[in-house]
Structures are given as structure tokens and as C-alpha cells.
Amino acid sequence: MSDVRLRFAPSPTGYLHVGGARTALFNWLLSRKEKGTFILRIEDTDVARSTQESVDAILQGMAWLGLGWDEGPFYQSERFPVYKEFVEKLVAEGKAYRCYCTSEALEAKRELAMKEGRKPKYDGTCRNGVEEPGDKPYVIRFKAPHEGVTVFDDLIKGRIAFNNDELDDLIIQRSDGTPTYNFVVVIDDATMGITTVIRGDDHINNTPRQILLYEALGYPVPRFAHVPMILGADKTRLSKRHGATSVMAYRDMGFLPEAMVNYLVRLGWSHGDQEIFSREELIEKFSIEAVGKSAGVFNPDKLLWLNHHYIKESASERLAELLIPFMKERGIVPESGPSLSLVVKTLQERSRTLVEMADGAIFYYRGDFAYDEQAAAKHLVPDAAPLLEALADKLEALADFSQASIEALFKEFIAEKGIKLGQVGPAVRVSLCGGTASPGIYEVIEALGKEETLRRLRRAVAFIG
């Protein structure tokens, strides 16, 4: 194992968003490629908004995508003593100070700066020490350098520089004694030995402040890679109005995890013109430097196309297992009907999602369906009844009820009767499926099995009268 250490650090204030999932995936892929360590950290310092339900949703989403972690999950809420120790260290070394300025005074200074056309930032009233009564509330600020430039080479964006005189003296501990995000993230990354930080580009402006904290604490500064955000089709930030944004919502909509992984990694990263990647190929070929600088646009049609590909390529036995909850949602107990694996085989080519597959499978398990009125009027006609009855008799005598034998029987049957398949096929399809849209009739007959096929054909004959 190498010294490369990466982390995914979500806040448990909601579900695992597709943007967060992509960030987790990039970190996971790089850790696997470099034979490093992938750490999961839950940033739950916002106790009021953090929920166990959200933690569970994040862990569930990670597990569904197959993004296992090597260390963790670590919870920031359990590390407050660690943060307090580092705050006290900075204060003792003169690198942080107590600030007694009230929120009203700070707001007045902010408004004045805006009025005078200056960038609003803390003016350093308490920076060099002030005598205040011990019972007055205070925050603790980091004493940031006001001269020079903070520069870092972003692995995606390139060189980025900030003038230090534009940076505030960052609050690192609130008046209630709790640490702030920008402080705890540095302490965690430093003490956990994180070597590369891959995160959303909405964190770029936090980076110079965090670099200055690393330097003040005497820790090595990790490499940074800021990933562009994901946009909706209208080029605004992806949100619920664009459709589902939760990873687990896509699972519930019948998407396969490998399709989601393949789609997410291609939202910003590419390897030539290749579209389909196995997990092994992704680990081998992924590089953070190949992630584009511009935002990716979420395209549900592309995700559907990928999902259809993976459904067609997947083993029917695995899909059958995944399909069971979708069937039960529709009130169907698959054990009470034909082999679900055989049913799946008939639907793989035509199903883009497991939801579509489950809907397409219903007729196999409900033999009492009503016939589509138009289809019945057109195909379940008096001339069809003797053909269906004769076909049922032939099928009843068939010993080998495989698709190949069924197809051979049909060819023999239409030759005997001197008819074309089109003169009996649609009537058979409506008899077995209730309508004219279904998988191939030979596949359907094999999946239904002899007993159910005969029952449905004779039911149709009785319907015709």
C-alpha cells in the first residue's frame, strides 16, 4: 500500500447527491489506482442540521455504488476535544486571538465598507490584544498574514493565487466554543494524513485560508483538485427541479449501480472516445489531471442509454434478484409463477430500467388479465379459435418445451395449415400477453411453461366463443 491517502467528507444534512457521489467516486478511483487509502469522514459539526437518517442514506448510497472505504467512518462530532487542543495551541503561539467584537459592531463595519466601496472584511480591532472582562463572549480568530500571496497548483484548474491582504482573520472557534468548518477540515485532513483533497470547486475560495492554517500548524499542505460542478440541461446548478438528484432515487427508478458509476465518472472525465468502462478499466485509466475544467451537464437520456447497455449485458440471474423488490411493489410474488430468470431474458433487450422490466413482466404472473379491446377485436376473432385450439393440442404433445423446439413446432404448424405466421401469431400474442406489444412469442411460451401457455390459449378460445 502506498502513502497516498484520500477522503470523502460529506455533511449528513440530506441524501447523497449525484455531485457528492461523483466526488466520492473520483477520490475512490484515485485511491485504488495509486494503491492508497480511502477514508470516509462524516462532517457533522452542524449538530442542528445533521441527522442519523442522512448518515444512513450516505452510507447506503456509497455501498450501492460499490465505493468501500478503508478507514472510518470518522465523525467530527466525536473529535471536539482534538479541535479544542489545536485552537489552544494556536492561541498559545500567538497565531490566533480572542475577538470580542459584537455581531452588531461587525455588521456596522461591514455596511460602512460596502458604502465606501471596500471589500468587507474584519478590520483587526482585536488582532493585537485587547483587555476585556472575562465574562464577555468572544470568538477566536486565526491571525492570517496580511502580506504576500498564497499560491497553489490545482490539479484540475492550474495555478491559482490569492493576495493575502484580501483574506479575513478567519473565525476558528465560535462564541459557544464550537469550531468552524474551515478549521476542523484542516485539522482532520492534517491529522489523518490526507495527501490529496478532491472536492467541488465551490471550495476554491476556502483553500488559501486552509493553506495558511496548515502552514501555521506546521503540517504539509496536501495537493488540491477542485472538480467543476454538475449543471442541469438549462446550464444552472443541478437541483430537484431538473429531476432526481439523489443517488438512491436512481436505484429506486431501476438504474444499475455500474451504469451510475460509468455515467458519473464520464461527467467531467474522459479517455479518448470510449464511453463504456468496466470498474477495472476505470481504476487503470482514471487520472484527476484528465478531468475537464468546465462544468458537466447532467443528461438523463445518456444515463438511460448506459443503463440499457448494462441491463442487456448483465446475467439474467442477477437481474432477477434485483427485480424482486420491484415485482413485490406491483403486488406480484415471483415465486408463484414462471422462472423470473427466464422472464428477465425475454425482457433484457427492451427494458431500459428495472422499473420498465417489472412493468413488462406483470403479464407473466397475472393470467386473469383483461385483453386490450382493440387487440382483441382485431385478432381474437372466430377464425382464430380453431387455430388456437389446434396449436394448443400440438404444444401439449411437445416433450421438449425449449424455445428452439417451440419455434420448429410453429413452422410445422403453419406449413400444415397452409397459412402464414401473421395469420396466427398476433392472436397467440394477445392470448398469452393481453395485447400486441410483448417479447417474441417463442420466448414468452418457453418462459410461461406448457401448463400456463395451454391455459391461456384455451382461455382465449373460450373468450372468442
UniProtKB/Swiss-Prot annotation:
GO terms for cellular component: cytosol. It catalyses: tRNA(Glu) + L-glutamate + ATP = L-glutamyl-tRNA(Glu) + AMP + diphosphate. It is found in: Cytoplasm. PROSITE patterns: AA_TRNA_LIGASE_I (PS00178). A motif ('KMSKS' region) lies at residues 237-241. ATP binds at K240. It holds the Pfam family Anticodon_2. Keywords: Aminoacyl-tRNA synthetase, ATP-binding, Cytoplasm, Ligase, Nucleotide-binding, Protein biosynthesis. Its EC number is 6.1.1.17. GO terms for biological process: glutamyl-tRNA aminoacylation. A motif ('HIGH' region) lies at residues 10-20. GO terms for molecular function: ATP binding; glutamate-tRNA ligase activity; tRNA binding; zinc ion binding. Catalyzes the attachment of glutamate to tRNA(Glu) in a two-step reaction: glutamate is first activated by ATP to form Glu-AMP and then transferred to the acceptor end of tRNA(Glu). Monomer. NCBIfam families: gltX_bact. Belongs to the class-I aminoacyl-tRNA synthetase family. Glutamate--tRNA ligase type 1 subfamily. This is Glutamate--tRNA ligase.
